[in-house]
Amino acid sequence: MIVLGIDPALGSLGWAVVAKESAKLKYLASGVIKTSSKDEIHHRLSYINSILEKVILEYKPNMAAIEETFVNTNSVTSLKLGYARGAIMSLIGRYDLDMREFKPNTIKKTVTGYGHAEKDQILHMIKLLLPGTAAITNSDEADAVAIAYTCLVTKNY
């Protein structure tokens, strides 16, 4: 089973690919897709999808796992995040991947044992749980690894 974990965002989206071989988890790759707020939204969404499409074609995941989002007090921010999620879900559908969504507290609890963990705690734990992740310093990238990890260890596939 290969899972593409996605921490959805418009400005700094984290992605990660983690595989489960027998009972072992194996980190394959991860990264961050950054877009500029100066660019028009449709160009930003297209860029995000073009990078994620390359990841899908290279690693051939069976499933995508994405963080559920909450409604922000800033409605414009929430709407833009909704655009990003919709574009990502459309790409996931185009490649006929199964998809799971996880609440932020579920991800935090699965990775750290505490549902209200801070970003640095998640980063620390993924480095302990998955060999190969030591070079990760970006919290969006770490969150994407945590999302893929959560999908695999909760057997939510």
From Swiss-Prot:
Location of the protein in the cell: Cytoplasm
One Pfam match: RuvC
Active site residues of this protein: 7, 67, 140
Catalytic activity entry: Endonucleolytic cleavage at a junction such as a reciprocal single-stranded crossover between two homologous DNA duplexes (Holliday junction)
GO molecular-function terms, A-Z: crossover junction DNA endonuclease activity; DNA binding; magnesium ion binding
Keywords: Cytoplasm, DNA damage, DNA recombination, DNA repair, DNA-binding, Endonuclease, Hydrolase, Magnesium, Metal-binding, Nuclease
Cofactor(s) the protein needs: Mg(2+)
Binding-site residues for Mg(2+) 1, renumbered to this chain: 7, 140
Top-level division of the source organism's lineage: Bacteria
A biological-process GO annotation: DNA repair
Any one of the GO CC terms: cytoplasm
Cofactor note: Binds 2 Mg(2+) ion per subunit.
Record text on subunit structure and interactions: Homodimer which binds Holliday junction (HJ) DNA. The HJ becomes 2-fold symmetrical on binding to RuvC with unstacked arms; it has a different conformation from HJ DNA in complex with RuvA. In the full resolvosome a probable DNA-RuvA(4)-RuvB(12)-RuvC(2) complex forms which resolves the HJ.
Similarity section: Belongs to the RuvC family.
Role description: The RuvA-RuvB-RuvC complex processes Holliday junction (HJ) DNA during genetic recombination and DNA repair. Endonuclease that resolves HJ intermediates. Cleaves cruciform DNA by making single-stranded nicks across the HJ at symmetrical positions within the homologous arms, yielding a 5'-phosphate and a 3'-hydroxyl group; requires a central core of homology in the junction. The consensus cleavage sequence is 5'-(A/T)TT(C/G)-3'. Cleavage occurs on the 3'-side of the TT dinucleotide at the point of strand exchange.
PANTHER family: CROSSOVER JUNCTION ENDODEOXYRIBONUCLEASE RUVC
The protein's name in its UniProt record: Crossover junction endodeoxyribonuclease RuvC
Organism name: Rickettsia bellii (strain RML369-C)
